[in-house]
Swiss-Prot record:
Record has Repeat as a keyword: no
GO MF annotations, alphabetized: glutaminase activity; imidazoleglycerol-phosphate synthase activity; lyase activity
Pathway recorded for this protein: Amino-acid biosynthesis; L-histidine biosynthesis; L-histidine from 5-phospho-alpha-D-ribose 1-diphosphate: step 5/9
EC number(s) per entry: 4.3.2.10, 3.5.1.2
Keyword hit for RNA-binding: no
InterPro entries cross-referenced by the UniProt entry: Class_I_gatase-like (IPR029062), GATASE (IPR017926), Imidazole-glycPsynth_HisH (IPR010139)
Keywords annotated in UniProt: Amino-acid biosynthesis, Cytoplasm, Glutamine amidotransferase, Histidine biosynthesis, Hydrolase, Lyase
Active site residues of this protein: 87, 193, 195
Matches recorded under CDD domains: GATase1_IGP_Synthase
Assembly and binders: Heterodimer of HisH and HisF.
Protein name per Swiss-Prot or TrEMBL: Imidazole glycerol phosphate synthase subunit HisH
Record NCBIfam families: IMP_synth_hisH
Amino acid sequence: MKVVVIDSGTGNLASARRGLEIAAGRAGLDAKVIASADPLDVRNADRIVLPGQGAFADCARGIAAIEGMRGAIEEGVAAGKPFLGICVGMQLMAERGLEHEGAPGFGWIKGEIAPISCPGLRLPQMGWNGLDFTSTGCVHPLLNGLQADDHAYFVHGYALRDGDQAQILATTEYGGPVVAMVASGNRAGTQFHVEKSQEVGLRILQNFMVWTPEGTSGS
């Protein structure tokens, strides 16, 4: 199995790669995990991971600046390859981001990325926070082995707004419910830094490594 962590210049590549390697080992998989900015590697991948940090528009520009990368991602997803977006990588799955000048997203999940509304609370949200699973999340294979109120590590000031409840797997509480995890078909994303979320994050990554979304043949 070949897993590609996309290097768009804005992600935490080393931690994501290491987490995936540990997860593959726990799952008993013979997996090669690489970080790459080469669209050909993405086309040849069995699983695709897109980490991202910073502003939505900057991450979108990072993808656009690599000739052929957006097309390679779309081709992989259309072919049924499992995709995982991390932090801003998840946000890019939405229709649009409103940070700074605003920018279009991939349009894979409904909603836009907007500032968190939490009067009296510090922004960005930074630290450990509990996960609340939705009815969709409770039966989703990416959350197998996890329990309600398991904690994950967040660093963000923007979040998905006006999303489709059927695409939301988990929320967290920060001045109100904030979307923490989404999925649509073979595309999934975590607003939290799954690669920094210790055992909870490793469990999700392990689930991702063995995930066979409905309608795909697996890898």
